[in-house]
Design a protein with these regions (language model features):
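Conserved SAM-binding strand-loop segment of SAM-dependent methyltransferases
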Residues: 65-72
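C-terminal helix-rich "cap/oligomerization" subdomain common to oxidoreductases
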Residues: 1, 5-16, 83-85, 121, ...
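Hydrophobic residues in well-ordered beta-strands that form the structural core
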Residues: 21, 109, 115, 134-136, ...
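Beta-strand-loop-alpha-helix segment that lines the small-molecule cofactor/substrate pocket
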Residues: 78, 83, 89-141
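Contiguous beta-strand/loop segments that form the cofactor/metal-binding neighborhood of enzyme cores
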Residues: 188, 194-271, 298-310, 345
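N-terminal Rossmann-like dinucleotide-binding module
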Residues: 2-62
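Active-site loop of classical SDR/Rossmann-like NAD(P)-dependent oxidoreductases
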Residues: 30, 49, 53, 288-299
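Predominantly a Rossmann-like dinucleotide-binding segment in NAD(P)-dependent oxidoreductases
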Residues: 27, 140-220, 336
Length: 345
């Protein structure tokens, strides 16, 4: 019996949508749990080049051996599906996404959409050509905190936002490809915060200036730290400071947000608090209710987009703007100059 991940119910549809999950080891393993808990999706096949990861995921969720495959081509030839969930390293995103789309499957893909803007645009173009849904799982904006901050700004309670400072400090001990990246924080993590910025301020970026570095104690090959200054099209400015080798105090994965507005301010760090000008009192805001949250909401939004034949909130086309922020940051870090984000779109 599949159970919901949140106290509020969602509309349960009679027929589950069928999903092939490509990549079930590492982070993909946690996705198998979320898919298995969904009342909207049914995993009909697992695909992974790592035989041990495949066996472990199959054993955990009673996936029959004849529905476990080492390549997507074999899975497509053996099972019928509505969509593919892609949880593999970014360098093979385009290959797997194009293969899925050409087979007529809708695609939900982990961020980043692709390893280059050119490859990301190819995936978006293929989905558009075939009238299939392409969604990037930017799950950080699907959390109650982010939803609550945006609602608070939209109410006008604290006035118009002017600038924000976002701090992110973690020390994850990853294995695999992230350790070998030149810019692991920017490529694999900051896109979550960049996308959340676009969502919260309901605006797109215009220019970016970035510096990155590698502390002596870092266990990453590349630069795991960055400072990014962002100007949005609506005039809001942001300063983002991030680290994946923080040995002192850590933030949540969402980060610590301080937003200065014309009538007060907002502080989001687990809880969302507001404070009006000339007031000694701060108010803890009530979270926006959501039927599901995080990656469970990604699956819900993806299913809704397919069922209702509409674009998902974090469609591939929309996500190009978040991905462009990453590549503009990378260019700025290399050149030492401010970079226009639109040049990547």
């Amino acid at each position: 019996m599949k159970t919901l991940l949140c106290s509020e119910s969602v509309e349960v549809l009679e027929a589950l949508l069928r999903l092939i999950q490509v990549g079930v080891g590492g982070f993909g393993r946690s996705w198998t749990d979320i898919v298995d808990s969904s009342e909207l999706w049914d995993a009909v096949a697992y695909v992974d080049i790592n035989e041990e990861a495949l066996k472990e995921a199959a054993a955990a969720h009673e996936m029959p051996k004849d529905r476990c495959f080492k390549d997507l081509e074999s899975a497509l030839a053996s099972v019928e599906a509505d969509a593919a969930l892609i949880v593999v390293p970014p360098k093979v995103h385009m290959e797997i996404a194009l293969q899925s789309l050409k087979a007529g499957l809708h695609v939900l893909i982990e961020k980043p959409l692709a390893d280059t803007m050119e490859n990301a645009k190819r995936i978006v173009s293929e989905a558009d050509k075939r009238s299939l849904k392409l969604m990037v799982s930017q799950n950080y904006r699907f959390r109650r905190g982010a939803r609550t901050v945006r609602r608070l700004i939209e109410t006008g309670k604290v006035g118009n936002p002017s600038y924000a400072v976002v701090n992110f400090h973690k020390a994850p001990r990853f294995r695999g490809f992230r350790l070998r990246m030149d810019h692991p924080l920017l490529i694999d993590m900051a896109i979550h915060h960049f996308d959340t910025m676009r969502y919260i301020f309901n605006s797109d970026p215009s220019s970016i200036y970035c510096e990155t570095w590698r502390p002596k104690w870092s266990w990453f090959k590349g630069d795991p730290c960055a400072t990014v200054m962002i100007k949005m099209e609506n005039g809001v400015r942001l300063t983002y400071v991030g680290s994946w080798v923080s040995l002192g105090w850590e933030t949540t994965w969402d980060g610590d947000w301080r937003i200065e507005c014309s009538e007060g301010g907002i502080h989001w760090n687990e809880k969302v608090k507001s404070k009006l000008r000339d007031s000694a009192n701060e108010v803890t805001e009530r979270f926006v209710p959501m039927p599901l949250e995080d990656r469970a909401y990604s699956l819900y939004e993806f299913a809704e987009a397919i069922r209702k034949d509409r674009e998902p909130e974090t469609s591939g086309q929309d996500n190009l703007k978040s991905l462009a922020m990453v590549f503009a940051s990378l260019e700025s870090a290399e050149s030492g100059k401010s970079v226009s984000v639109n040049k990547y779109l």
